[in-house]
Regions:
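Secreted/extracellular ectodomain signature
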Residues: 1-153
Length: 153
């Protein structure tokens, strides 16, 4: 798992577009496997679209972020998720998410019109946090560029 080195506006092309951005970043960094964005729209999020991994979730730097899916979605991370696919510290402080700590869509929260628009706003997570703010911190205008959390499936 990694934080995307590249930043994007909230017009990501929906969840599928965000997943493709993660996959492209992973492939460019010579990572094998399938990668998806930790991102939710009005009806879907990682809790319904991800493989719920029974194995450890490791950052690009090799740190254990969570022991398994249950640990990942319990509200706190063991280590910060703050390294890009290139193995360097992620510059900046926010990622697009609109995802609860449980991996579910956040009802009533804005998500850049299902991640297709630069209008409105979208909720963000805080890069480097290990408490709930890693995924649920603040909102940002959709025209602002933010990073993505990318998870191997």
């Amino acid at each position: 798992m990694f934080v995307s080195n590249q930043t994007f506006t909230g017009a990501l092309g929906g969840l599928a577009g965000a997943d493709q951005k993660c996959q492209t970043a992973a492939q460019a960094a010579m990572k094998k496997g399938t990668f998806k964005a930790w991102l939710s729209d009005e009806t879907k999020g990682p809790s319904t679209t991800f493989v719920k991994n029974p194995r450890k979730y490791l950052s690009t730097s090799g740190l254990v972020v969570a022991n398994n899916w249950t640990d990942l979605t319990d509200g706190a991370l063991q280590s910060p998720l703050s390294v890009t696919e290139l193995g360097v510290a992620a510059p900046g402080d926010r990622t697009w998410t609109t995802t609860s700590t449980a991996g579910a869509p956040q009802a009533g929260r804005e998500q850049c019109t299902n991640w297709t628009s630069q209008g409105n706003s979208g909720n963000t997570g805080r890069i480097g946090a290990t408490d709930a703010t890693w995924t649920d911190d603040n909102k940002s205008p959709c025209g602002t560029t933010r990073r993505l959390y990318c998870f191997e499936q």
